[in-house]
Amino acid sequence: DGRFAGYQAALQDSGFAYDPSLVCNVLNNGPALRAVDKLFDERNPDGFFCFNDARAWYVYECAARRGLTVGKDVSIVGVDNHRVFAETLEPQLTTVELPHYEMGYWAACKLISMIERKPVDSSSWPNTTAPMPPLDSPIPAKIHCALIEKGSVRS
């Protein structure tokens, strides 16, 4: 997965070694909460980078059960900028925004361009928050994702 490869590359670029014991690969409530609890018990981490904003909720929950304050005692970053999680968790979740609208718009334009075998006039594209790659980019194409800084990371 691209996110996992990016996580490993960011660790390496920052001079940290990848440690598989710090990675939890869980899909649902019970196992996720137990995995986060185990990390707190065994490693006492000061921060979490979560696969998505929904997974970040588990870290908030475990931190609260331990009397820890998110953004002060522990930092949490999610991925998606999913409004239900990123804006309703307290403090609000710092997150890497996936530009879903832009990704869908680009994919639809790319598909139309391929079906019609002609380029799409990109001058008529909507103004978006994330720059879109050219339609002649190879698939898979990379789209810029912005870090949306909120209150869940210690300053």
Where are these regions (language model features)?
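Bacterial carbohydrate/catabolite-sensing allosteric modules
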Residues: D1-S155
